[in-house]
Amino acid sequence: MGQIFSRSASPIPRPPRGLAAHHWLNFLQAAYRLEPGPSSYDFHQLKKFLKIALETPVWICPINYSLLASLLPKGYPGRVNEILHILIQTQAQIPSRPAPPPPSSSTHDPPDSDPQIPPPYVEPTAPQVLPVMHPHGAPPNHRPWQMKDLQAIKQEVSQAAPGSPQFMQTIRLAVQQFDPTAKDLQDLLQYLCSSLVASLHHQQLDSLISEAETRGITGYNPLAGPLRVQANNPQQQGLRREYQQLWLAAFAALPGSAKDPSWASILQGLEEPYHAFVERLNIALDNGLPEGTPKDPILRSLAYSNANKECQKLLQARGHTNSPLGDMLRACQAWTPKDKTKVLVVQPKKPPPNQPCFRCGKAGHWSRDCTQPRPPPGPCPLCQDPTHWKRDCPRLKPTIPEPEPEEDALLLDLPADIPHPKNLHRGGGLTSPPTLQQVLPNQDPTSILPVIPLDPARRPVIKAQIDTQTSHPKTIEALLDTGADMTVLPIALFSSNTPLKNTSVLGAGGQTQDHFKLTSLPVLIRLPFRTTPIVLTSCLVDTKNNWAIIGRDALQQCQGVLYLPEAKRPPVILPIQAPAVLGLEHLPRPPEISQFPLNQNASRPCNTWSGRPWRQAISNPTPGQEITQYSQLKKPMEPGDSSTTCGPLTL
């Protein structure tokens, strides 16, 4: 609420106090050549090291990067060592300047050149990797703009207004580095600023040039043309310096065009440190105020009025509502927000399992996270319906009279919308699918998971109406087979002109080539528990009219579940035969040395029990198939003994 996030700091780090600007530009150029690029931590460590190195200025007069590298402590943090290594290599590549020619006699002086024609521009023979790298005290060399240079400068000043301190600092560094001519400065102005700002700057520059020409400039010749023309001459470095200063001074008269709509909208957050809030205000004023405008009164006023209530109370109690900025920062230095952020200890989650879910059969989640409702474990104890829980039984709900359906209508889909609210007994729990109810003819039924009860004593056969589009619909009995990938229909349901394709089918009896055909015509299958037919784009055709199978392709469309109730049958006792060979004959015989003191009296009950005749036991019949084997305890079987052991087998 009211919190404005801080804007990034100035993209150009400021040089440490006591270091010349052209030396600091050398370090910046070397740092930006690092791969990957430098971070703010690298610049912080570089400035920290240079502050220490400036106490020994032996390396700076003239500058000697090798001597500076020897002052670097071993294991110094950051990438200062890499920056110094780049500077040492670059300094070794720069050729030494040739000595000036000796002065010639007055008798062999060359004729004076025409002052109206500037001398031609001479490209330097050896381009420098770092343009500002020059001996101490020597002026920089002129270098025209390149597109990448203009783009880099525009990116640096994109968040600052023309004439702001950040804008002027970047432009001054660029002018000092490239030593541009009047034409280069005009190109830079048109690339960075809008046409309105360029027009205002041009008017202010003309007035400053007129005042300077009237006042008089060292080296300016009125007969050689205007100052702009003479400043384009690379040899006239004095005039070019004067023109550059006038060009920079013309920005002071431009109106401030801040990026922020209002400085009053910069508010301190409830948990934001006070120094971070003041830093955001300082950056906003630097980007918006014209250079030369007093910033401290505005900054002190906003630092108090836009602070949060707790910091305002601290400043009022100590009498620093309009004090210097340092006193205000010290007053709120010990303030910490009362609302502590809660640390949530999140239990690490296990990776999703690869096995299928026990409820829906899909992999990728645990069964406790499954979105499918839990199916009932068995039929309802009240109505014996296997499709719902006891709490959802319609016998526990008030009956609603329903109109009788038409005689020829098939069983409709299970409805998803219930006309009366559910009455959940014993509270909570997972809800099961709605009960099997008739849907009104004027309602739109929606299909949910139907449960098909089957008799385990019979084959899973269901009556279905087949429409092959080439003959009249026919009703047949089809086998429900969840192991068949495709539906199989007899060829008697199709007309003689139905297009069929040969295909090979792999079944339990092996692979067949000519028993089944493949049809590409759509087939409609109407099941008794669905109103909408199942549409199959293709199916198998049995040429011998032996099979009619509803496969998985049809069952998946209706999302059916086969319910097989458990049948209670009496246990059947069947004899089993024990193996004659145990499979342990390859092991060595045990030693005959007595290893343990055995008590013969303690083993008599076991011998007595093992000598009893065969015992039979009948277990209580339980649902499902359960096998219980009983055998006689006897001595280990000798090799070649083929005696068998019989016992009861309970199914």
From Swiss-Prot:
Short sequence motif PPXY motif: positions: 118-121
Pfam families: Gag_p19 (PF02228), Gag_p24 (PF00607), Gag_p24_C (PF19317), RVP (PF00077), zf-CCHC (PF00098)
ZnF CCHC-type: positions: 355-372, 378-395
EC numbers, comma separated: 3.4.23.-
GO biological process: one example: symbiont-mediated suppression of host gene expression
Keywords: Aspartyl protease, Capsid protein, Eukaryotic host gene expression shutoff by virus, Eukaryotic host translation shutoff by virus, Host gene expression shutoff by virus, Host-virus interaction, Hydrolase, Lipoprotein, Metal-binding, Myristate, Phosphoprotein, Protease, Repeat, Viral nucleoprotein, Virion, Zinc, Zinc-finger
Polar residues compositional bias, start-end: 641-651
Region (Disordered): 93-142, 631-651
Coiled-coil regions listed: none
Residues forming the catalytic site: 481
GO CC terms: viral nucleocapsid
Motif (PTAP/PSAP motif): 124-127
Keyword Repeat included in the entry's annotation: yes
Modified residues (Phosphoserine): 105
Alphabetized GO MF terms: aspartic-type endopeptidase activity; nucleic acid binding; structural molecule activity; zinc ion binding
Note: HTLV-1 lineages are divided in four clades, A (Cosmopolitan), B (Central African group), C (Melanesian group) and D (New Central African group).
Protein name: Gag-Pro polyprotein
Native source species: Human T-cell leukemia virus 1 (isolate Caribbea HS-35 subtype A)
